[in-house]
């Protein structure tokens, strides 16, 4: 929740002036490289070493950002006495001469961010003191200390907005902002502030917005800026936030205490208008139930506040936590990334106007739903990434979530939800129960069922539009579990076997589905079962991580724009993929990590022409002669390694065997002729019989 730099505001003001020509409109002109239109001179980034002197003298806005001016001399701006806005952002300024602004009586907004004004700060301060009508001043990024800042702001009582962000302020006292009784907005983020003396802001009676983010404040005690409406103290090292205990009305509406080291829920004003409270990423918890209330002396903390010669002692009951804080106007509460193990009784009852509650990434194990807890105005509830094993619904309670629209229960330990939890939840549109080991009820659960929750029933939830059941270990769907809903987004990913190889359990919601994720659900290659023709409004389909060997079927008029077929068993790209009319509207398709055969990707060129984006084109590979080749590197036409496959197989083997047989025959003949005579002699000698005569 940082403030936009003032130079951005000026830039926006400049951009709304259109560069056009026509009746009654000044024509954009170039003056030494600067663009000039309607009294605005834009000289950004022109490598100027000095302020140009040839611009129209009636210019009201001069933008000199990103020019190496280094110095602003007494005569630099004399030619432009009507300036109202001047931006010198990143101009390497280290000196502003004493009378540089002497002729600038109309100047209202001045941006000096990201320069080196600390080097000659006394002379620069003297120049600023002549701007008696200045309202906005940006001194961020100038390496200013608190003494330098005090001198520069001295006597500038007309200021309404000041930025001292990204400087080297460390300790604040009442002398820095003395005399700024009209100041409305103060930006002190990204300094090194570790201490703020009591009364440092007391003179700023009109202050409404204060940004102290990204500093080193260890605590805020006795906070008493009743006129403040916005306070950002995020990204400090706060361990305590204690508002003054006086029963006085506070105007504070937005309080950002996120990304600190708070141990306890902040002690807020007893009477206030707070509607947004940001507490994420702290170390908070509720501790009342963990301590023995019979020992009151062990339940208080005393803060010793030393202000000059005055010492004050503030005593705080540690375990009263939220009881004395006024939360009646609170609408947005973010308590994520803390150490909350439970919500104490009555906590949510103190927030009747609460519409958004974020409790993700805590240690909640159980949540009790009672009357007015959560409040009836709640529209968004995030309980994800906790340790929830049980949700308790008070007996006879109905309509507790009647205005709830978004309910996130993902990444918990739930087995089911209480019967009747979603009764009369007529506004709910989004439910995320992914990564819980739940099961879907095979049939409607009786209203009077009093047993422990063992399943979840989504039937007849007419308002439900988005349902995520990713990684829930669901068994095969039976009996149309989504009947009576009008789902547009459904995620059943990482539930192996949930569809039992067929998409027929989804036909009840096929006409309304727009986004369907069936990643890693065990879909096979049955062509009849993979027909998505009935899903007429489907825009995005994720079928990655399955075992598909052929493209799914799409017929009729289909609105499909994104198709993900990664990590399947596809070996070829059938020609019908390109020729089918429903697929020609695809804008993005994912096809990588499939065992394609390089001899079966003849339609790849046509595929690239018809589909606007093959998102993973560079990662699509195929198998060619036991080698993995990227499809984009294949030569045009049929690859050489595929030509042999076009020849008759019998002829191929004949050609392969015939040379071997001929070689063997010739070898045998040569051997026989070579050893013919010795061989005959051996035969005769061994086969000789003696004569009987």
Swiss-Prot record:
GO terms for biological process: ERAD pathway; immune response; inflammatory response; microglia development; sequestering of TGFbeta in extracellular matrix; superoxide metabolic process; transforming growth factor beta receptor signaling pathway. Its main location: membrane. The keyword Nuclease does not apply. Disruption phenotype: Mice develop paraparesis and neurodegeneration and display reactive microglia caused by defects in TGF-beta-1 signaling. Mice are viable at six-weeks of age and immune organs and leukocyte subsets are not affected. However, significantly increased reactive oxygen species (ROS) production is observed in primary bone marrow-derived macrophages (BMDMs) upon zymosan stimulation. Mice are more susceptible to Toll-like receptor (TLR) ligand challenges: the macrophages and dendritic cells produce more pro-inflammatory cytokines through increased activation of MAPK and NF-kappa-B. Keywords: Cell membrane, Disulfide bond, Endoplasmic reticulum, Glycoprotein, Growth factor binding, Leucine-rich repeat, Membrane, Repeat, Signal, Transmembrane, Transmembrane helix. N-glycosylated. GO terms for molecular function: receptor ligand inhibitor activity; transforming growth factor beta binding. The chain crosses the membrane at residues 652-672. GO terms for cellular component: cell surface; endoplasmic reticulum; endoplasmic reticulum membrane; extracellular region; plasma membrane. Induction: Down-regulated by IFN-gamma (IFNG), LPS or TNF-alpha in bone marrow-derived macrophages (BMDMs). Residues 1-19 form the signal peptide. Mainly expressed in cells of hematopoietic origin, such as in immune organs such as lymph nodes, thymus and spleen. Among leukocytes, expressed at higher level in myeloid cell such as macrophages, neutrophils and dendritic cells. Highly expressed in central nervous system-resident macrophages, including microglia and perivascular macrophages. LRR repeats lie at residues 58-79, 82-103, 106-127, 133-155, 158-179, 182-203, 206-227, 228-239, 251-272, 273-294, 329-350, 353-374, 377-398, 403-424, 427-448, 463-484, 486-507, 512-533, 537-558, 559-580, 585-605. PROSITE patterns: LRR. Glycans are attached at residues 74, 85, 155, 232, 292, 309, 312, 408, 424, 500, 623. Gene3D superfamilies: Ribonuclease Inhibitor. Residues 606-644 form the LRRCT domain. It is found in: Cell membrane; Endoplasmic reticulum membrane. Belongs to the LRRC32/LRRC33 family. Key regulator of transforming growth factor beta-1 (TGFB1) specifically required for microglia function in the nervous system. Required for activation of latent TGF-beta-1 in macrophages and microglia: associates specifically via disulfide bonds with the Latency-associated peptide (LAP), which is the regulatory chain of TGFB1, and regulates integrin-dependent activation of TGF-beta-1. This is Transforming growth factor beta activator LRRC33.
